[in-house]
């Protein structure tokens, strides 16, 4: 599948590349699992509600989440961190 990143998600991903390789590896494992299994698999996938209806989240760790949706052959990644984290 094609991976499409929002600006915020890409910024989060670049942050993890510089700051924490363990978290980066977890994000890559989650993306690989999303590519293979869609809305099931590791990271406790759960559908989001209300304004984010149609999106799903998976746990990166205790605080951070990857937020995504799948349409046709594309994974749209909206977030891969926490909006609580100071940059």
Residue ranges and their predicted role:
Residues 2, 11-25, 29, 42, ...:
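Enriched for short, Lys/Arg-rich terminal
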């Amino acid at each position: 599948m094609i991976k499409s990143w929002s600006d915020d998600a890409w910024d989060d991903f670049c942050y993890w590349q510089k700051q924490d390789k363990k978290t980066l590896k977890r994000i890559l494992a989650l993306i690989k699992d999303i590519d293979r299994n869609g809305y099931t698999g590791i990271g406790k996938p759960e559908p989001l509600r209300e304004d984010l209806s149609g999106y799903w989240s998976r746990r990166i760790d205790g605080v951070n989440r990857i937020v995504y949706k799948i349409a046709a052959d594309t994974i749209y990644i909206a977030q891969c961190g926490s909006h609580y984290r100071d940059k």
